[in-house]
Amino acid sequence: MGCCGCGGCGGGCGGCSGGCGGGCGGGCGGGGCGGGCGSCTTCRCYRVGCCSSCCPCCRGCCGGCCSTPVICCCRRTCSSCGCGYGKGCCQQKGCCQQKCCCQKQCCC
């Protein structure tokens, strides 16, 4: 039994059997994380721990859901995000529901 579409990962993403089972538990069951992981180029982050174990490109979302594939994502909100420190900066705009951009990068 895989959660968040871990069963659809196959060998492409890896780490589905061990990582996703403990990371998701019952919280991500049902339609909460519909769509699964897919490949790491089309992977979507939903909630923290949902698809991060299957797709390395998704490392936990901050403050809700990420609707677009991102390279990195942290749990900090925009009010506490500092781009100068190099943390929480995504290479794509609109990575989070709450966002603040500086130097053409999205801090989430």
UniProtKB/Swiss-Prot annotation:
Cysteine disulfide partners in this protein: none
Other remarks on this protein: Human have a similar number of genes as other primates despite the relative hairlessness of humans.
12 X 2 AA repeats of CG: annotated span: 4-84
Record's protein name: Small cysteine and glycine repeat-containing protein 8
Role played: In the hair cortex, hair keratin intermediate filaments are embedded in an interfilamentous matrix, consisting of hair keratin-associated proteins (KRTAP), which are essential for the formation of a rigid and resistant hair shaft through their extensive disulfide bond cross-linking with abundant cysteine residues of hair keratins. The matrix proteins include the high-sulfur and high-glycine-tyrosine keratins.
Keyword terms, alphabetized: Keratin, Repeat
Family listed: Belongs to the KRTAP type 28 family.
GO cellular component, one term: intermediate filament
Keyword presence, Repeat: yes
